[in-house]
Curated annotation (Swiss-Prot):
This is Phosphatidylserine decarboxylase proenzyme. Is synthesized initially as an inactive proenzyme. Formation of the active enzyme involves a self-maturation process in which the active site pyruvoyl group is generated from an internal serine residue via an autocatalytic post-translational modification. Two non-identical subunits are generated from the proenzyme in this reaction, and the pyruvate is formed at the N-terminus of the alpha chain, which is derived from the carboxyl end of the proenzyme. Pathway: Phospholipid metabolism; phosphatidylethanolamine biosynthesis; phosphatidylethanolamine from CDP-diacylglycerol: step 2/2. The record marks 188-189 as: Cleavage (non-hydrolytic). The modification Pyruvic acid (Ser) is found at residue 189. Disulfide bonds: none annotated. The gene is psd. One of its GO terms (molecular function) is phosphatidylserine decarboxylase activity.
């Protein structure tokens, strides 16, 4: 059975109500050609099914391992690069960007277990999510989780051209577990994750990943190193 995310309940209710009224109007004899009426009926039905599909929230079994960095989102890896992170770390980090299309699951998950050390919401623009400046210009959130061994991972939810609503659930000081649901972005977006330079990257450009399942990187604790 399709499990629906809580963020979609109001949107689904309102959308299906509007689509129902449209179809009732078509059935009731709005003056249109048969071909147009049929096309509108099929289109509205497909749209309703897509809205239900978009807000799906599949159950996932998480294979938790402390040294692993799991993907925080479903989507395609569109960037892997070394960059200066100027909001929290203020030093060079490895940035991995995951683009979420409107057909991906949009649940966001914690890549590691630890404590939420930092969180900030940034209002902004709505450039397309794959635009180079979207990570600094768009509406976004920045969150940092600290592992028990002191290693910190920053991940950033970025709204895209369609997405205009970011949700992040934990509060600073909360304990989060690897693979736990921590947020949601509606209708197409991007998620950036910033890792230490010594991280052993496990993904490639254009690779498709699944939140809470795909291994993004490995970071051994300082004791193991």
């Amino acid at each position: 059975m399709l499990r629906i995310h809580k963020e979609g309940k109001i949107i689904i209710r309102n959308s299906l109500f509007i689509l129902l009224l449209l179809n009732l109007a078509l059935i009731g004899g709005v003056r249109m050609s048969k071909s147009v009426t049929t096309a509108l009926g099929i289109s509205s039905t497909l749209l309703g099914l897509w809205i239900l599909y978009f807000f799906r929230n599949p159950t996932r079994l998480i294979n938790k391992q402390e040294e692993l960095i799991l993907s925080p989102a479903d989507g395609k890896v569109v960037a892997i690069k070394q960059i200066y992170e100027d909001e929290y770390f203020k030093e060079e980090r490895i940035q991995i960007s995951i683009f979420m299309s409107p057909f991906n699951v949009h649940v966001n998950r914690s890549p590691i277990s630890g404590v939420l050390e930092y969180f900030k919401y940034h209002p902004g623009k709505y450039l397309v999510a794959f635009h180079p400046k979207s990570s600094t210009k768009n509406e976004r959130t920045t969150a940092v989780v600290k592992r028990i061994d002191g290693i910190e991972v920053l991940f950033r939810q970025i709204a895209g051209f369609v997405a205009r609503r970011i949700k992040f659930y934990p509060k600073v000081g909360d304990e989060v577990h690897q693979g736990d649901e921590v947020g949601f972005i509606k209708f197409g977006s991007r998620l950036d994750i910033f890792l230490p330079l010594n991280a052993d990257i496990q993904v490639n450009l254009k690779e498709h990943v699944r939140g809470g399942k795909s291994i993004i990187a490995k970071i051994a604790s300082e004791e193991e190193e």
